[in-house]
C-alpha cells in the first residue's frame, strides 16, 4: 500500500495572482494499491466513486504518459483535513496525491519536475500544484508551454492564521467576477508588490509585508462574494496582523502574524463569536517539504 501526504496550499498570495503559492501545515492523506481488477474507493462519498474522480483521473493521466495498462486500482482517502472549495488547494492535493501514487506504482519512473508538468496540464495553472509538490513558497510561470518555477523555504519567524468561512466558493464562480482586461496602472501596482513580497520573505522584512500583500487584480472583485470579508480583513490588521490577503479564489482569509504573537488567534476567534460569524480559525505554519510518502501506519 502506497501512502501519500499532501499539504494545503494558499495561492494568489497577495499580488501574486496565478503565480505565487505557499504550502501550509494542513493535510490530506491518501493510500493507493494496484488490484487485480476494477476500481475500489474507500473514505470517499459515493457520488465521487467513479472514473470522474479527480484522484483517479490524475493517476490514469500518469499511467497513460508511461503507456502503462494497470489492472485495477484501490484508492483510499485516509485523512481529509483540507476543506473543499475554500481557497486552500483541495483539488490540487488530490491531483498531486494521485500523480505521486501512480508514479510509485510505476516504480518512480517520473521526476518531480515531470509530475509538476502533468499536474499543470490537469489543473491548468501551477500556483497550487507547485507548492503542494515542493512545499514552501513557489513562484511559477508558464514559458513556451513549460513550467518555470523557483522555491523559497519560509523561516519560522511567521505563522499563518487561516480563517475559513462556513460556505464554499467555487473557483469558476470566483473567476466570473473578474474583469476581462486590466489597466496598466493595476498591472504595475501588482508587479511591484509581488516583487516586494518575495523580497520580504527572503530578507525577513516582515515589517513591509502589509504593503506587499495589497492587490488590484482579484481581491476587490471577489470579496463581494464573501459576506463579512471587509470586517474580518480589517479586524485582522487591527489585532496586529503583519499582512492579510484572500487565499486562492476565496473565501478563506489568510493572516500573516509574528510567530511570537500568542493572542491573535484567540482574539480573532472571540471577534467572530461576538459577531456571530461562524468561521473556523486555524493556526498553521509553512510546510517546506511538500508532498511526501508516508512510512508505516497513518
From Swiss-Prot:
Presence of the UniProt keyword Kinase in the record: yes
Superkingdom per UniProt: Bacteria
PROSITE patterns registered for this protein in UniProt: GHMP_KINASES_ATP
Subcellular location: Cytoplasm
EC category: transferase
Gene Ontology molecular function, alphabetical: ATP binding; homoserine kinase activity
GO BP terms, alphabetized: threonine biosynthetic process
Reaction equations catalysed: L-homoserine + ATP = O-phospho-L-homoserine + ADP + H(+)
Residues annotated to bind ATP: 83-93
Pathway(s) of this molecule: Amino-acid biosynthesis; L-threonine biosynthesis; L-threonine from L-aspartate: step 4/5
GO cellular component, one term: cytoplasm
EC number: 2.7.1.39
InterPro entries, alphabetized: GHMP_kinase_C_dom, GHMP_kinase_C_sf, GHMP_kinase_N_dom, GHMP_knse_ATP-bd_CS, Homoserine_kinase, Ribosomal_Su5_D2-typ_SF, Ribsml_uS5_D2-typ_fold_subgr
UniProt keyword list: Amino-acid biosynthesis, ATP-binding, Cytoplasm, Kinase, Nucleotide-binding, Threonine biosynthesis, Transferase
HAMAP family reported for this sequence: Homoser_kinase
Function: Catalyzes the ATP-dependent phosphorylation of L-homoserine to L-homoserine phosphate.
Family statement: Belongs to the GHMP kinase family. Homoserine kinase subfamily.
Name this polypeptide is given: Homoserine kinase
Species for this entry: Clostridium botulinum (strain Alaska E43 / Type E3)
Lineage: Bacteria, Bacillati, Bacillota, Clostridia, Eubacteriales
Gene: thrB
Amino acid at each position: 500500500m502506497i501512502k501519500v501526504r499532501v499539504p494545503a496550499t494558499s495561492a494568489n498570495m497577495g499580488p501574486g495572482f496565478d503565480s505565487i503559492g505557499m504550502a501550509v501545515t494542513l493535510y490530506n492523506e491518501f493510500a493507493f494499491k494496484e488490484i487485480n481488477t476494477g476500481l475500489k474507493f474507500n473514505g470517499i462519498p459515493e457520488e465521487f466513486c467513479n472514473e470522474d474522480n479527480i484522484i483517479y483521473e490524475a493517476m490514469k493521466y500518469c499511467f497513460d504518459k508511461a503507456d502503462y495498462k494497470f489492472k485495477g486500482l484501490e484508492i483510499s482517502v485516509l485523512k481529509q483535513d483540507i476543506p473543499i472549495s475554500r481557497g486552500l488547494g483541495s483539488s490540487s492535493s488530490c491531483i498531486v496525491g494521485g500523480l505521486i501514487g501512480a508514479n510509485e506504482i510505476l516504480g518512480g519512473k517520473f521526476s518531480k519536475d515531470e509530475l509538476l508538468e502533468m499536474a499543470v496540464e490537469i489543473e491548468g495553472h501551477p500556483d497550487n500544484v507547485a507548492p503542494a509538490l515542493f512545499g514552501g513558497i513557489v513562484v511559477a510561470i508558464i514559458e513556451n508551454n513549460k513550467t518555470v518555477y523557483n522555491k523559497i523555504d519560509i523561516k519560522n519567524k511567521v505563522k499563518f492564521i487561516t480563517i475559513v468561512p462556513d460556505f464554499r466558493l467555487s473557483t469558476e464562480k470566483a473567476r466570473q467576477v473578474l474583469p476581462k482586461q486590466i489597466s496598466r496602472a493595476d498591472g504595475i501596482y501588482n508587479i511591484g508588490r509581488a516583487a516586494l513580497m518575495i523580497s520580504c520573505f527572503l530578507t525577513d522584512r516582515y515589517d513591509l509585508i502589509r504593503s506587499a500583500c495589497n492587490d488590484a487584480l482579484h481581491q476587490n472583485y471577489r470579496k463581494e462574494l464573501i459576506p463579512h470579508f471587509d470586517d474580518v480583513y480589517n479586524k485582522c490588521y487591527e489585532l496586529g496582523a503583519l499582512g492579510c490577503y484572500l487565499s486562492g479564489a476565496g473565501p478563506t482569509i489568510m493572516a500573516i502574524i509574528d510567530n511570537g504573537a500568542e493572542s491573535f488567534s484567540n482574539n480573532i476567534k472571540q471577534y467572530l463569536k461576538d459577531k456571530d460569524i461562524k468561521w473556523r480559525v486555524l493556526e498553521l505554519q509553512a510546510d517546506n517539504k511538500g508532498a511526501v510518502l508516508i512510512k508505516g501506519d497513518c
